Amino acid sequence: MTNLLRLIDRISPWLLGPWRPASIVGYVVAVVFLCGSLAVIGLRITAQTNHEIDPFDQGAYVGMSKTMEGSWYPWYSDGTRNPLFPWLAAILLDPNDAEFFEKGKQLNVALAILATAAVSAFFASRVGPLAALNSCALCSLAALLPISTFFGAEPIFLVLFLFVCACAMRLLNENPLPLYLLLGVLTALAWLAKSSTTPFFILFLGFSIVRWLLSLSFGEKMPWHLRAPGWRPGRFLAGLLICLAAYFAIIAPRLVHAHKTWGSAFYNLPSFWFWADDWETCVNKYADCRQVRLATLPIEEQPTMQGYFHRHDLGDALVRLTNGVVVRLVQLFHPEAKWRLSVERKDKPKRIVLPHRGLYLIGLAALALVMCGVAASQGRLEKLGPITLPVLLSLTTFLVYLMATGWYVPTGPGHRFIMTLYMPLLWLVVQGGDQLRAISGARLANWLYLAGHLAISVLLLSRVVELLQDTRFEKISYAF
């Protein structure tokens, strides 16, 4: 036993960090293997599944690509979807090609692989080698690869939203002006992919104002978990102006098009469908929600908050919200709703790229809590620094998106809405756990953390090998 513990102590630095030249080489090789595997698996799936262009999202994106053929900038919207992905498809492919839809899916797989490479660098800059590799693999297998087999904006949006969250969290504790510029650019690009970035951006602005007021009122007299020496109140207003200027400069062509077409720069049909009772009503009655059109409808038929509460009472609203939240929690953490290890039938085509995707999140969160307990027992939590505002922003974001997507279930039941949170949640629990392990300075923390991540590595590697050996899919479930 003593020799085993010595061996574990010897290999721990190579797997948990700090990074060494050999660790970097091994990590790069592993990421290249992962990206190559994603290419093989993803292209096989696109060749086997999803050959019918549906009349809604995928069909609409195809139509948007044709409209933006030859465009110098992503400016066009159909009132529901944003233009970044169809614009890229129009630039990199020929929208008039009979195989445009199939090639567009292949392009999306390629974008998912590029996103995986970007995510690998992101995690490598924040956690140790093993945790970074597991995080990268989970992002790709659980989120990026499944949705990339469709013709849609999600792969681009998911990785951009992760970077937006990371940049915003950092800006709550240190605020150099270039970081505000970066946030404005990233948020604008994410919004051009999908407008789902907007609630988080608003929350960030609110928490930034809280940080500003705290700094002006208390200065360095705040407790350790709020004190942020790298955050300067004098930079806030200038940084905010830089951020907003970059944001609106990038999305301006899209806003101009919307204003000319529908009379409102931020016209967006899903914001009206949010208050509808079901998808059929959206299709049949709410295809046009311009103000002049809504004015012709009785109040109780309008897709607005006022219209909803003319049709329903508070009890109905609470039932809808509660039921929707339960649906979204199941979709995020345990979509299979089966507790056996294998959810697939032998000799049958697959439907899931990574089974039990949410249980990995739960396991990593539990591991982070264990690391927190060890660090607290050592009296070293203060070494974490100013964590309160980033943690509160994270929790608020989770609750807001959970309730918003839960409310939206009757009109938008797809998994992709709640999967917006998967990669940011993964980043938070992994980086939090790694930092807590490091500050604890305890051998026990290293042993437990190493054991947990080695177990995850074995599970993920076995799944990749299994998919390489047998990539027969009849459809992709729990993604779109």
Say what each PLM segment does.
Residues V119-A142, L158-V159, E174-P178, L182:
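Transmembrane-helix signature of polytopic, membrane-embedded enzymes
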Residues R81, T149-F157:
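Short acidic/glycine- and proline-prone juxtamembrane loop motifs at membrane-interface regions
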Residues A47-V62, W75-L88, A98-E102, W262-L269:
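Extracytoplasmic catalytic/substrate-binding loops of multi-pass membrane glycan-assembly enzymes
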Residues S23-G26, E99-A110, H310-L395, Y422-M423:
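Membrane-interface anchor segments at the N-terminal boundary of transmembrane helices
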Residues S135, C167, L179-S195, F201, ...:
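Membrane-interface alpha helices of multi-pass inner-membrane proteins
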Residues S125-V127, V164-L179, A190, W212-G219, ...:
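Membrane-interface transmembrane helices that cradle and orient dolichyl/undecaprenyl
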Residues Q106-V127, V159, F163, C167, ...:
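Transmembrane-helix motifs of polytopic, lipid-linked glycan transferases
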Residues F236-L364, S462-D470:
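Membrane-lumen/periplasm interface segments of specific transmembrane helices
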